[in-house]
Structure formats: structure tokens, C-alpha cells
Amino acid sequence: MFDLLRELGIKSFSFRAITDNAQVAETVKQCGVDRIDLSGCHVDYDDPASQERVIETYRAAGVKITGIGVVQLKDDEAFNRRYFEFARRAGCDVVSCSFQPDGYESTLRITERLCDEYGMRAPIHNHGGAHWLGNATILDYLFRNTQPTIGLCLDTAWCLHAGEDPVKWTERFADRLYGIHFKDFVFDRKGKVTDVVIGEGALDLPALLKAFAAAPFNGSAVIEYEGEDAVDAIPRCVAAIRRLI
């Protein structure tokens, strides 16, 4: 059973302004957690030597890498393989992804093969109402036409941005939920979004955590906060979640 109290982590994109991975690891631990989902701003997928240094930096700091992404997959097996190779060496099995509509079927067949080969899961990240993978209809279609290794990386705030309900998504896609970005927005009258401490915006955090606890989850569960005050805000996000567990 997934223990969110202990296994909650942080999406490294939240700390994209910090380029030194040792400092990122230290900041993660200062937030009261010891897990991270690595974004491309903190790893070079074309440089295996630097990748090993990244992995060792987090290992030495006692910070577990629970996933990577969001990576942009293509209809190109060699290109996509780089991500799975890194994930295997990093000791995680979640490669959150996105891809373009052109050639999507071939991209997914390649991804399924790589998941099987590497023992990975590739959850699709929903990125708001303007993104073609940001609505439940297309996600349901894709899940019905792919192997179970293809799932959902639920970004709760971007789900809200699409006019959808992350609580219902958590329930509907429970069996394919392999990643979650706990994130919250407030919306102004024109629909412009601002990151806020989770639970202080449009997200029904108590209902989400109840649905999450009922799901058979075993993946990468992280807080993501994209505001410039992330170092100050994320400890409050951690506390907000832990108060309700």
C-alpha cells in the first residue's frame, strides 16, 4: 500500500531556478521530504557521464528519484530509449510523457515495447485545456487502445484548467494512475492562472486525497509549484497534504 505520508516528493521543475543538483537535493530535504521526480532542467539526456553524476548526487544526499519527465516522446525508438535508459540507472520505473498527434499510434507502440523491455510505466501528462492530451475523452480512448503500462500522470491544476475534475479523474483512471503532480491554481476573471499553496485555490484537496487513498497507486506522487516563491511555498504544500492524511 502506498504511504503518501512517507513517499510524497517534489517535482524538480519547481526548483528550475536552482541549477546545481546538490542544492536541489538539499532544498528538497529542507521541505521535509526525501523524494524527487526529475525534470529535464536537471538532467542532460544526451550526456551519460553527467547523468551518473546526477544520480550519485541524489543518492549521496539520501533523496530517492521516483520518476522522470515530462519527456516528449517521438516516433523514434532510439530517441525515446535515452529516457528509459536513464530511468533504469536512476532506479525508478515511471517515465511521464507527452507526444504530438502526428504518428501517435506508432509512438505509443514504441513506448509499449520500451516499457516491456525496461520494466517501466509511461504515464501521459495532461497539460491543460489547450493541450490535446488534456481532456478525459482522449485519455480514455488512449487507455482503451494501449497496454496497461501506458497510464496517467495526473497534474491536478492543469486538469482544473481544462474544466475537468481531478477527483473524478483519480477515481475514473485509478487503475492507470502511475503519477500525480499535486498542484493548485487560482483563476482570474479572464482565466489567467496563478500557482498557490495546494488546497488554497480551486482544488478540493480533502476530496482528492480521499480518492487517492482509495486508488491502487504505486508510482511517483509529487508536489509541483511553479511560482517564483517555490522554496517558501512548497513546505506549506507538504504540511497541507500531511495535515489531511
State what each model feature region is.
Residues 1-9, 14-34, 77, 91, ...:
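Histidine-acidic metal/acid-base catalytic patches
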Residues 19-22, 26, 35, 57-152, ...:
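Active-site acidic/histidine proton-transfer and metal-coordination neighborhood
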Residues 37-55:
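Glycine-rich, proline-tolerant flexible connector loops at the mouths of alpha/beta enzymes
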Residues 41-42, 128, 182-184:
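Short, acidic/turn-prone active-site loops that include or flank metal/cofactor-
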Residues 42, 74, 101, 186, ...:
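Flexible, active-site-proximal loop/turn residues at the rims of small-molecule/cofactor binding pockets
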